[in-house]
Amino acid sequence: AVQNSLDDKYRIPPMNAGNWAVYGGIVRDVRLVVTDPVNIPFQGSYKHEGGTFITTPEVSAKQAAVRIRTYVQNQRPDAAEVTLRTVVTDADGNVCERLNASQRIDAGQIAEFDQSIPKFRKPQLWSPDSPYIYNAYSEVYVGKELLDTYHSTFGIRSVAWDYDLHRLVLNGKVTHLHGINRHEEFPWLG
């Protein structure tokens, strides 16, 4: 059971002023995730590594390079021979690429699986006007036993800053930035 109370909030500055909330506690949905000791840790849960880190180092309308780095940890008392299978699909669920890699992970260690698609043909480029999203489904196996799955989404795009023009360049085109600042805690502030 969790008790989340801030009964004494007016002695915690600046709560009395009402401009910003300095607090602790649960402010978002919470899930309890139970995994096998050989698993893909959530991002930031293991020395700021975890999950899947996807980049697109080379992008054009004809093809792109996609790099998928996935971290797998072994919390078992013995080493494990781990296979990572990654399936990349388009927004409709059609398989674009299948990747496989194996390595031994010693007990209590984390390993990085570095997988790449050097020539991803005819990518749908992500932009604010066309936010096309691909999926990466990662599966962790020891032997033939599926131990963990992890789903990531990503857009294929190039992003650069033009220092001469002081503008963002997205997929080779100048893109204007728009945004807001909003405090999620209080609808009447921000």
Give the label of every model feature segment.
Residues 1-190:
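Secreted/periplasmic carbohydrate-active enzymes, especially glycoside hydrolases
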